[in-house]
Amino acid sequence: MAATLCCRLLPKAGWVPLTQSVRHGSKAVTRHKKPVHFQKQKLLAVTEYIPPTLSAPPAALAPRVKKTGEESSLAVMLRKDLENLFQEYKMIAVAQNNAISAEDMIHLKHRLKKHAINVKFFPNQVTRSFLNSSIYGNMSPLIFGETVLLASKEPKVKEMLQALRHNPQIVLLGACIENTLFSYQGILSYSKLPSIAIIRGELVSGLTMMTSKTVSMLHHHPAHLSALLQQYVKQQSSADTDKDASIQEAAA
């Protein structure tokens, strides 16, 4: 009897009961804020920002005066160097740098240095302040972006244009040549003029030709010279009379 009861009551191996009792425990609540430590509470109370009370409304207060910033010592030094540059050099050209590489810039400096043309870099703010306070104020509109100054003690425009032809990243904007401002077209026209040495040679050859003619005329007979002088006087007198007649006709 007992054996049969035990067999009925005790669960068999591998048998799962139809209903099971599951115990649900209380969940831990973690959303409660921790209380602030009393020392931290004291520190927060002491360091709490208390806005000042205004004695007058904001509209009645006077506006703040902005302090004008003085030029730094570096700006003063660069300004002095720029002033000396305009005094010593006869040709100063302004060009814009359109992202030229460092290697190409080195080659350009080397080509310009062969013709005694120096490449100078100055901050735009310093350059504008100097130009606006000098006789070269008309050059200030050329100073914008990354600018480069090409300076030489003698005007060597043709050599400068030949050197810049290999670097299209350097765009020539204008130049001041012997205290005269030139645009890009003016620089091209100036480069087509003959050099000073050629002009001097032509002048000397013309003067020597005139002196040689004068010497050859002086070697002639005095009667021939007097006849030439009389003819010259007659031509001058006839020219003066024609001029007076034209003036009288215009006045009438």
Swiss-Prot record:
Signal peptide: none annotated. Belongs to the universal ribosomal protein uL10 family. It comes from Danio rerio (Zebrafish). It is found in: Mitochondrion. One of its GO terms (cellular component) is mitochondrial large ribosomal subunit. Gene3D superfamilies: 3.30.70.1730. The keyword Ribonucleoprotein applies. Its main location: mitochondrion. The gene is mrpl10. InterPro entries: Ribosomal_uL10 (IPR001790), Ribosomal_uL10-like_sf (IPR043141), Ribosomal_uL10_bac_type (IPR047865). SUPFAM superfamilies: Ribosomal protein L10-like. GO terms for molecular function: structural constituent of ribosome. This is Large ribosomal subunit protein uL10m.
